[in-house]
Amino acid sequence: MAKFEAPQKDDLQEKLVAVNRVSKVVKGGRIFSFTALTVVGDGNGKVGYGYGKAREVPAAIQKAMEKARRNIVSVELVNGTLHHPVKGRHTGSRVYMQPASEGTGIIAGGAMRAVLEVAGVHNVLSKAYGSTNPINIVRATVDALVHMKSPAQIAAKRGLNVDEIRG
């Protein structure tokens, strides 16, 4: 039975990062299915990723989009860039990102670029080390963004004011 859902009006940007054909070997031969990796974001500090698998590509993409919408996290940005250099990792993938001046653009590869675009980052320098598997790169990028702290958050944690933190 097919599910019917009204189109969502949440103004999220959606990006398809990767589609992959996978197979399961059974006694009668191979059963093919498709996986899809997607990222969604509002372009203003909210970003999520999802991974879907189905027998047909559109169904896999739809599942991935639904999972991405349920998996949204908030990231605090400043003037379209990061607060400070950050590192993230997931399994064999490591990412490094640092803030960049206005006009630099998003200097990032494939999967990392998609995450940064939908998150609302406009100027950043980044590099991926180790495995460049798109799933791991997306997870490492989101990990790095989540662990980034603003000066106000650090000051509150230390019980100081922002001016004392900045020195």
Curated annotation (Swiss-Prot):
Q: What are the GO MF terms of this UniProt record?
A: rRNA binding; structural constituent of ribosome
Determine if Aminoacyl-tRNA synthetase is one of this entry's keywords.
no
Domain S5 DRBM: start-end pairs: 12-75
Q: Name one GO biological process term.
A: translation
Q: Which domain of life is it from?
A: Bacteria
Reported function = With S4 and S12 plays an important role in translational accuracy.
Q: What is this protein called?
A: Small ribosomal subunit protein uS5
Species name for this entry?
A: Shewanella loihica (strain ATCC BAA-1088 / PV-4)
